[in-house]
Amino acid sequence: MLHFILVLVGGAIGSGSRYLLSLHITRTYPGTFPYSTFAVNIIGCLLIGIIYGLAERFQLAVHWRLFLATGLCGGFTTFSAFAYENILLLQNGNYTAFTVNTLGSCMFGFTAVFLGVMLTKISI
């Protein structure tokens, strides 16, 4: 139960941080390009890299990994987890899985969003 609470609290902090940062970036850089999402995804990738790097170097306890990586970064952006998992695939020499995961996630993700939007336009 403690692990669940740690992920929950970390997720709340990550989500709140994403919201505040997105507001700031959108106000600072208005326009059609999604600067806030782009920035959040890149910052999240940097954070999860730092967290997992420090976790390995200093044998960080599992509850800290859950709070910081799964909770905080997961609430901030799931793109960071996607990027980290792909790095692991590359490091393990699993190039086929890396390619399938990268291309598949992008293609199916975009397709799923498109289908979701289209489903909202169907008259019942």
From Swiss-Prot:
Query: Any stretches that span the bilayer, and where are they?
Result: 1-21, 35-55, 70-90, 98-118
Query: What are the recorded GO MF terms, alphabetically?
Result: fluoride channel activity; metal ion binding
Q: Provide the membrane topology annotation.
A: Multi-pass membrane protein
Where does the protein end up?
Cell inner membrane
Pfam families hit by this protein: CRCB
List UniProt keywords, sorted A-Z: Cell inner membrane, Cell membrane, Ion channel, Ion transport, Membrane, Metal-binding, Sodium, Transmembrane, Transmembrane helix, Transport
Q: Activity regulation per the record?
A: Na(+) is not transported, but it plays an essential structural role and its presence is essential for fluoride channel function.
Listed under GO biological process in this entry are: cellular detoxification of fluoride
Does the record bear Membrane in its keywords? Answer: yes
Under catalytic activity, the entry for this protein gives: fluoride(in) = fluoride(out)
Kindly list the positions annotated as binding Na(+): G74, T77
The chain's coiled-coil residues are none
Domain of life of the native organism: Bacteria
Main localization of the protein? membrane
Q: Which GO terms describe its cellular component?
A: plasma membrane
What is the role of the protein in this entry? Fluoride-specific ion channel. Important for reducing fluoride concentration in the cell, thus reducing its toxicity.
Family of the protein in this entry: Belongs to the fluoride channel Fluc/FEX (TC 1.A.43) family.
PANTHER family in the record: FLUORIDE EXPORT PROTEIN 1-RELATED
Q: What is this protein called?
A: Fluoride-specific ion channel FluC
Species of origin: Cytophaga hutchinsonii (strain ATCC 33406 / DSM 1761 / CIP 103989 / NBRC 15051 / NCIMB 9469 / D465)
Taxonomy, top ranks, is: Bacteria, Pseudomonadati, Bacteroidota, Cytophagia, Cytophagales
